[in-house]
């Protein structure tokens, strides 16, 4: 931990935390360089006793310290589940107009606020957890649940919310429900933080600032949130062409058909390069009696990128043709007339398409829906 980024109370407390506790509770203290990004749209706020601020996961009070410094007359509410951090925060701001509540924010009943600011916990819900389908589909995450509750229950009309959260909010298919809500609001800022001073996390993060008023379309593209404006292209998308889109097969469904013989090729992401199929010594094959296979010609699209935080998305695709072949479920299969496949291949080869993909793909994965949304540049 860079001590210059935190108050002494936080650096001392951080030393007492185990990696297990930090991971389980999603504890990542917010460094000063990142905290400052949360206050870029607060210049018009009046520093008056009637001005109210909420920090829904206040921890040891790093973000509250910024609030106290910038708005000393405001009424500040902090909510913290962890008893130790709640106690530290209460003592730290005992002489200020700060009220710390030791509760689970997702169960907390509170009022509405002019400004909500924070860095909510990043914790994926366990398998089997029943999601609120207004927030997420598939496996939810605490950070989107915090975000939804803040917007729908605690943000005043024309109030502003500023959060540091994983960049998956921009295009993850899991979080499409809450993203549809966000897009209806005025997104003042959305910035991908490829470089940041957080400790103990390689999660790609973003800062998002939302005003509780009707949206303007800024920082949005169809059903996605992005950090650059992208022109809309009418109905001219890959998904509008006369093509069939499918995903490959999960390993569990083909495992019994694997063989050492060179029979039916089974491609994985590692085989798909830029306009090239790579067949190496570790190539997988299926027996002729497999029921899981494709036939004929197709364009194979690698959906998972090896790119890390701060790097560009590594896009891969290639045409392939054979009597029988199969792919894993990290590959999208596009089939159709040769002339139409050639159109898609030409689009994917263009630099402008690569730039487009790198704007929208901020979590290292292209979904089929996002692939279909690529314009015919």
Curated annotation (Swiss-Prot):
Q: Which Gene Ontology MF annotations are present?
A: DNA binding; site-specific DNA-methyltransferase (adenine-specific) activity
Keyword line: DNA-binding, Methyltransferase, S-adenosyl-L-methionine, Transferase
Q: Which SUPFAM superfamilies match?
A: S-adenosyl-L-methionine-dependent methyltransferases (SSF53335)
Does tRNA-binding count among this protein's keywords? no
Catalyses: a 2'-deoxyadenosine in DNA + S-adenosyl-L-methionine = an N(6)-methyl-2'-deoxyadenosine in DNA + S-adenosyl-L-homocysteine + H(+)
Q: Which Pfam families match?
A: Eco57I (PF07669)
Q: Which InterPro entries match?
A: DNA_methylase_N6_adenine_CS, MethylTrfase_TaqI-like_dom, N4_N6_ade-DNA_methylase, SAM-dependent_MTases_sf
Q: What happens when the gene is disrupted?
A: Not essential for viral replication it can be deleted.
| EC code(s) of this entry | 2.1.1.72
Q: Name one GO biological process term.
A: methylation
* Family that this chain belongs to: Belongs to the N(4)/N(6)-methyltransferase family.
Q: What is this protein called?
A: Modification methylase CviBIII
Q: Which organism is it from?
A: Paramecium bursaria Chlorella virus NC1A (PBCV-NC1A)
